[in-house]
Amino acid sequence: MSRAPAVGMSIEHRRLREKLCRELAQSEHDAVVHTAREAARLRACPPAEKLRAIAAHAEYLRPRLDALLIPDQPFGIRIGRLVGEMFSGLRHLVADRVLSAERSYRATLLGLRHGIDVAWLLRDVTRREDNIRLFRFCDDLIAEREVLLREAERALVWFADHPSIAMASCAHTALGSGAATPSAALP
């Protein structure tokens, strides 16, 4: 596959990079917000602990991501995060209230996978632009986050061992009523 260094191509690469940067900022915002909310709903159980680890990782990377993205796109990155906050709010107020605990957990994992996919594509775009700092950031995010995501995916088995919690709606789980709460099911 050849890389033609045409002027039009570099403009298109820049536009694609800017779009992906906004999308990554939004996704990383979600990696903090959604994982923390989901972990709080699930309380003390293996899936919640895996989500807390992912939230901590996203928080840890955020200053580095901000240093790379905000100077080039201060407005665009803030808009990306604002959009992320709007979708997070909608998800919290509507979707998460009607989804079962395990389905909401899987939806969170799906969002995390999307973020890793964005990082992979952004990594390839930055490689073509010789943007080494952003390339390395994507490499680091991917290497660490994929491990954390695999661990969170393996924690799905916990729901098989706790079917009443798995089937409880998140609204029910979040209210902490009876044996449908993860902490009530633990010894």
How would you describe each model-predicted region?
Residues 13-24, 43-64, 104-111, 133-145:
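Alpha-helical scaffold segments that form or flank carboxylate-/histidine-based iron centers
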Residues 45-84, 152-155:
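Conserved alpha-helical segments that form or flank metal/cofactor-binding pockets of metalloenzymes
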Residues 32, 59-69, 90-94, 116-123, ...:
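A structural signal for well-ordered alpha-helices, especially hydrophobic packing surfaces
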Residues 17-38, 85-137:
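Acidic/histidine-rich alpha-helical segments that form the ligand environment
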Residues 108-187:
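Preference for long, well-ordered alpha-helical segments
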Residues 1-13, 19, 179-187:
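Terminal targeting/low-complexity segments that flank the catalytic cores of oxidoreductases
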Residues 2-5, 67-107, 167-179:
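Carboxylate-rich helix-loop segments that flank metal/cofactor sites and access channels
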